[in-house]
Amino acid sequence: MSFRRNGNLSSTLLLIAANVLIPVAIVIFATGFFPYKPLLPGLAQYEPLDGYGEPPEAPFDKLVFMVVDALRSDFVYTTNSGFKFTQSLIRHGAAIPFTAHATSPTVTMPRLKAITTGSVPSFLDVVLNIDEGDESSSLASQDTWLAQMKAKDTGKLVMYGDDTWLKLFPGTFDRADGTTSFFVADFTEVDHNVTRNIPGELRNDDWNTMILHYLGLDHIGHKGGPRSPHMVPKQREMDGIVSQIYKAIETQDHLKSTLFVLCGDHGMNDAGNHGASSPGETSPALLFISPKLKGLQKNQDSPLPDAEDFQFYSTVEQSDLAPTLAALLGFPIPKNNLGVLIADFLSIWPKKADQAYLLHENARQIQTVISAASGTKTFDGALPAESCASPTSDYEQLACEWQGPSNNLMSARVGDDMDSQWALPVVTWLRKAQELMSGMASNYDMSRLILGQITALLAVIFSLSAAIKTVSPTRSLTPLLVISIAYSIMMFASSYVEEEQHFWYLATSTWFGYLTLRGFKRANTTFPAHLLLTAFPVLASLRLLRAWNQTGQKHAGTPDIVKLFIEPHPHFLWLLVGLTYFWTHRQLVYSFHGRIPVPINYPVMTGLVLAAFTFKAAFTLEDAPELVVEFVKSSLLDFTRGASLIARARAVFVGLGLVAMAAMGFILWEMRGAGGNRKRSRRKKGPAEAITTLQHLYTILALTQSRTANIPVFLIFNLLYWFLSSEIDAPDGTGLSTVELGISSLLLQYASFFAMGGSNAISSVDLSNAYNGVSNFNVVLVGILTYVGNWAGPVWWAFGTVVLLGEIWRRDQRQKRLGSGNNGKRGSDEKEEEAEAKQMLEGGQISPFKTYVAVTTLFTAFSVAAVMAACTILRTHLFVWTVFSPKYLYCVAWSLVQHLVINVGLSGLLFWLGSF
Amino acid sequence: MPLVDPVTMSSSAIVKGAVAQSTSTTKSTPGSQATESSTTTAGSSSSLATLRPVQIKQTPAAQTVRHALPAALTALYLLRFDALVTNPVPVMLNALPVVAAFQMTYALLCLPAAGEPASKSNRKPRPGEKKKGGDIGSSTIITALLASVLTSIVTPFLYFAMVLFGAPFLTHGSHTFLCAAHLALLTLFPLFYVHGVDSAAWAAVGGFRAPLDETFGGLVGGIVGAWLGAVPIPLDWDREWQRWPVTILCGAYGGYLLGRVLGGTLFWGKKF
Ligand SMILES: [Zn+2]
Ligand SMILES: [Zn+2]
């Protein structure tokens, strides 16, 4: 007995140690993998360049910067584009077109950072992009061309469009009207709010910078893809605005020195999404427009035929915008810029000395960045010739190569006769420096990567020995180990990371196939009947889940149940949605039955479920109006007409909170009753049933935070849940063991995540429900809502598992009582039950919750260690920023939130509450 | 947890050669195929009524066919592989009668037909008596025909099972169906020939409690192989052979042949 206790204690300690090491490993590794890049503080000033005179005069003094979100290059440049006027400008040389290469992650905020600072934002900006209110993502204190235009003090800064600009540049704009992209179904209003400001501003002459950011085209992409019927009309609308602004520049005197830039912040893939690095996503259009540019005589062909790789005209880096604007508008290049002045514009300055000045300033500014990064003063003096014979670092190599371009600049400055290609070596050198500094490979902190890796391996060892000590017989861990090891191996192949869902689908079907086949042993039916009544419904449910949402990269956008059966048949969708809400209502009422009187129970629960249902209907009317059928509109929405979405969502959340508090109250009340008064009647419900109330309340929250087309999935979950529950109550001791329940739960948590549309790509993070009921941005609230919105299924299964664990626990106690042959006296029965419960909790016997935690910890430790190893080994791989880094972030979410917070913290609390 | 469920045990577990069960409990090896050995029980659980592993007939023809057919199937598969990759449906369709003929030959020459041979030899357990080689009577042919009918009946269900495990449902219907037909012909036809519609035998097979032999080994191998065949599909190698259902069929054939050979030799009589 004492040995058993010691073994139990040591396994508990090992389990705790493993769960402490997992977050430690994640943090250590992350600090080495996503290093914080030192930024040069302050605003750049013109510094005298040796031997040059004053900075050359700038041809422009005003800037209209028009961003059309997700404006892919072919939307402007090809034959079937709606930008007919813009194309005529290209032909006449008034518009100089480029394809601007946007680096991954291709989401708006990091792209705007690159465009305005000229630097390459770190990968962590993706997280901050989701977490839009974060202060650290603000550029107010950084050197950008906006700050430079403001510092010029020749006019005001105005902004109309996507409010990301307002978040990035708080307090920068003198006049602004931000639009938000809550609802991607909004194609027109969001753009109209920008356009209506333009005529007035074009008459104003008090500004020197006007930013316009249109979101409609991006919304059309997300909703219907690049070939949506709305796409070309939207392009025509945008073309009309280009024409309006261009004509104003042509005709109005105060606008005559205005530079007009039209660009996309990123492109989109064939499904209309963005975030990763497919050619479509990384190739937005970029045009510099002004009547003055006709002087360059760069008339080019337009429109062009389609190109597979989306590369039209010459390709530049998106960051090149910053130094080019600096030259064209006459301000110092922002300090952290890594962009290269676009050489096509050099001939605007007739004097070679001026051209040399601009290039030299660009080079000197990048050299400052390199010096700061390398921590040396490589460019201060001439390097000794011997160190250039065998350079020790990339930086030194670069410094040595500076000699040639530097000589060219010198000759150009003093007006030597040179061939027309003299600037080429300088630009080549700048590009090389840009490439080196943008490359992330040199920035890893290897010692931290290794330390994090070792910590994760320790967590694997600890969790493995804890699991071996906790679980008996040890061989029942085999399926879990097979899953964990197969998953770990899979993490090293980029395509398996992209297509992770297949692993979980196949594993889940196989596991449940095994469970149903095994169940036949004790079934009293014939084999065909068992197949038809048990195996078929379970496996068919899993097959439906698998087909519900097509996810992953390889077959993105191919038909799935949502596209084939749900979206074309909204009546069918609302039937299923109504059924889901009705079922939840039934279960909720039932779980309160006997606790509160029916006249209170029924109306309260009905009100709560109706509030949730009408919110969903009202939300869908905004988010996807084509899905709302007339019946829902007329019967439900008119009934509560006038309520705003925020008010509706808040009503649901407050209702859920109040009912949850009531349920908790019952638990505490019954706990006290159980402690003091033993004579609670058999009919009275225990805390175990109160836990199921919380489970059903969570279901309503999950429905509220899920896309409407995903709501019927919860009916399928209920069917699978019912199967697991029936497996527990097997009469002869062959029922589901705790380890088997743990494995089932793990599989269903992952499978449900992918079935509801999740994947390992940043672009699949669903933000549509992140702001339900939130009016002022609140990091914690939006974070929780986003998490529940994307992990609704996994959290549902975590709740379900706790209830099932309680069932297993009570079953084992019942069997033990039967085994001890002590089932005669009813009175002492309960006493014993409680004594045993105490004993179990105090470590006399292993609690099923501990076994469950051992199972999830083992898998989590394996997955964390494997993802880290994959990121370390493949850190120079092409896919590290597109596949493995996003996977790391997802792995962090799975292990920190889903495992530690939900499966250990929340489930532990619920299990503890239910075990009294 | 009892290994064998009381329900199954009591009701209908079959014993091939129930007479011999009490007389001989020595463990046999696949090499010593005297007449008696076919009547011995395999495995240690002789006190329980269990399914015996299938013995391959001892005739020279049976032993030749037993080894020649896997080689012939492998050769056929390798020969048609390129055509299969480019044109799966007609190739699978055309190969079906060939594979059926192979399996039919194998069953008739090598396997004991349902019920009959074992009981025949049990009724006259004279030591030293050689069984007449290759006595393909009319009853065995009827058994074989029945087995093929059962195989074709079960094919739609196998197709359905494949869909449940992730095969495409709305597209590639004929691909998946033909793949299921091949899988059924390989793995289920020999089992139907040997066990007929004996529900207890099938319960043992379905519950993975049957002892390993060429037929059950082939079933396990074929299913595991087809299952593993799904693994390379998501890889981004963009090879033609990654197309549905080439890898599945490949895995099924490879797994079946391996399972059949191993089940008939190394793991003969063993249980899970
Ligand atoms: Zn964007
Ligand atoms: Zn977008």
Swiss-Prot record, chain B:
Superkingdom in the source lineage: Eukaryota
Membrane topology, from the record: Multi-pass membrane protein
Sequence intervals crossing the membrane: 91-111, 145-165, 177-197, 215-235, 248-268
GO biological process, one term: GPI anchor biosynthetic process
Cell compartments where the protein resides: Endoplasmic reticulum membrane
UniProt KW keywords: Endoplasmic reticulum, GPI-anchor biosynthesis, Membrane, Transmembrane, Transmembrane helix
Family the entry assigns: Belongs to the PIGF family.
Any one GO molecular function term: mannose-ethanolamine phosphotransferase activity
GO cellular component, one term: endoplasmic reticulum membrane
Pfam family, one: PIG-F
Organism: Neurospora crassa (strain ATCC 24698 / 74-OR23-1A / CBS 708.71 / DSM 1257 / FGSC 987)
Known pathway: Glycolipid biosynthesis; glycosylphosphatidylinositol-anchor biosynthesis
Coiled-coil regions listed: none
Role this protein plays: Acts in the GPI biosynthetic pathway between GlcNAc-PI synthesis and GPI transfer to protein.
Location of region: Disordered: 21-48
Biased composition (Polar residues): 21-31
Gene name of the record: gpi-11
Protein name (database record): Glycosylphosphatidylinositol anchor biosynthesis protein 11
